[in-house]
């Protein structure tokens, strides 16, 4: 789990995520697809083009920040997203790529406001959140046989 300081720092980013979340996730997808084109087939490009996917991710990141001290509250949403991830054949090895580009997008969009402390806290938080998704996806894959 996350220490109290990490939780405090992540929660402190909620206002920035409310204001800039969609820009962060739009930047994230653009950069990730440019730098890691091999990951593109795992994503619904129609949802990318319509803006639905960046918006959904922005809302998920915001919800994670708002509930970082009790991520269990997000389990119904996590389980729903895990089903979609399994439909798309997402694998655990993709999570580090996602995390790298998410942190880079936070830095790119927020600039100097994305301090090392904030990026470190979000790196730790992302690791915990990724593990929650990986476990949910493992259960979903197992239930499918």
What are these regions (language model features)?
Residues 1-145:
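Globin-like tetrapyrrole-binding proteins
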